[in-house]
Structures are given as C-alpha cells and as structure tokens.
Design a protein with these regions (language model features):
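Active-site catalytic microenvironments for nucleophilic, acid-base chemistry
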Residues: 48-51, 177, 181, 185
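Short helix/loop capping segments that flank catalytic or ligand/cofactor-binding pockets
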Residues: 154-156, 178-179, 188
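Generic alpha-helical structural element
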Residues: 27-30, 34, 38, 102, ...
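N-terminal low-complexity, Ser/Thr- and acidic-residue-enriched intrinsically disordered segments
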Residues: 1-58, 62-63
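Post-HExxH zinc-binding segment in Zn-dependent metallohydrolases
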Residues: 117-125, 181-224
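Short pre-active-site segment immediately N-terminal to the catalytic Zn-binding motif
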Residues: 150-169
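Active-site recognition of the HExxH zinc-binding catalytic motif
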Residues: 165-181
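Auxiliary, metal-adjacent structural segments of Zn-dependent hydrolase domains
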Residues: 41-149
Length: 224
C-alpha cells in the first residue's frame, strides 16, 4: 500500500473509548473478586473441555486475559486492522479518490468502526481473538479475552448464580481456545482462506464503504 490506510484506526479507538458505556457499579473488592474468579474458572473450564472433547492441546497455550470494555475495544480494533489490512491495501491501491476525499473518507470510516465497536464492547462476554497482530500477543496462537464488567452486569440482570454463570462463559470461550490450541493448522487454514478472498475480491472502495455503513446501521438498530 503506497498511501495512507483507508481507515483511521487511531480515530476508531479514540471514538470507541469515548462512546463506550461505563460498566456496572462495583466496589474495588467486588471487581477484584470477579477478575480473580474468572481467572480461576478459565483454568477449570479448560480441564472440562479437554476431558469432554479429548482434544489434546499442543505447544504453547494461548493466553487468557480478563479485560474491561475499553481494552476489549482497543484489541478488537488491532485485530480488525490486522485481518483487513491486505484487503484495504488492495482497495487503497486502486482508489481514484483525491487526497482530500480520501482523508475525509478514512476518518469517517474510523468514526463508524469506533461507534460500532463501542456498542459491541458493552455486549460481548468473551472472545477468542484469532487474528491479533504479533505486537498484541506473544506467538501466533491468539488470545482468550473475558470481559469482566459485561459478565458481572449480565449475571446481575438475569439473577444467575455468579459462579455458575462465570463458569458457563468460560466453558463456552475455552471450547474455541482449546480447539485452536489442539489443531495447530486451523489458524493457518483460516488465514489462507482470508488471503484467497482478498486475491479474488473485486470490491471497490465505495462499495466497501457502503457495506460498512449498512453493518453499522444494523448494529445500532439492535441496541436496546
């Protein structure tokens, strides 16, 4: 890619961090308890998944982290930037827009992405992040993130037993982590599929922007 990126990723992070809703009201002791138990239950859940599936993890295990909404948002911008980089680079090279239009467009797209991820940051309970760039996580294995404020908020809202609900979330997310940890070629396969899509795509920048706007509108229409 010879020119500026088609998305202002820094603006996406800044916008998302400004728009993301605060988490539930917790004392410091309550917050520490949630984080500590999620870390403990993540280990327990991995053992359950391995015992049930008979999948045998290989090599260094992807890390498990407990994060807040803003950190989830920031890491997802990094992952989105990594996985869409080749496609956006291809589209950027073929773009006929002038420098001013391109500068405005990349900022608008950054605002849209930040707004969409700010909404999702208050909803996601956990996520196995496959495509994080090397500077975000050591090794190529991805990372499991558990979003503590969202888990605490939902368990309160539905009146669930905290330990049971947290274990359920950990079991769900550890299933993905164990799958990728036990099948080392799976991540490379997904990367090759993404690469094949990039090579085959004939989408122009304006069409991509239109699709992004539609996706953001769909996300917002689900709020509430």
């Amino acid at each position: 890619m010879t020119g500026p990126e088609l998305v202002d990723w820094d603006l996406a992070v800044a916008t998302g961090r400004r728009l993301v809703r605060p988490g539930p009201q917790l004392t410091r002791a309550e917050a520490d308890e949630v984080v500590a138990e999620l870390r403990k239950l993540a280990v327990e859940a991995e053992a359950h998944v391995v015992a049930y599936t008979h999948l045998q993890p290989q090599g260094e295990a992807p890390p498990v982290v407990v994060v807040d909404r803003k950190e989830w948002l920031r890491s997802n911008v990094a992952g989105l930037r990594s996985v869409t980089g080749p496609l956006l680079g291809k589209l950027g090279d073929r773009s006929s827009s002038g420098a001013l239009s391109r500068s405005i467009g990349r900022r608008i797209t950054g605002l849209q992405i930040g707004g969409a991820l700010a909404f999702l940051a208050g909803k996601v309970l956990g996520q196995f992040e496959i495509f994080l760039p090397p500077e975000e996580v050591a090794g190529p294995g991805g990372r499991l993130s558990l979003v503590a404020p969202n888990i605490a908020e939902v368990e309160r809202k539905i009146g669930a037993d905290p330990r049971d609900f947290r274990l359920w979330v950990c079991l769900h997310e550890q299933t993905h982590r164990v799958q990728f940890h036990a099948v080392p070629w799976l991540r490379g396969h997904l990367e090759s599929e993404v690469g094949a899509f990039v090579d085959a795509t004939d989408l122009d920048p304006s069409a991509l922007a239109a699709r992004l706007k539609s996706a953001v509108s769909a996300l917002r229409s689900r709020d509430g």
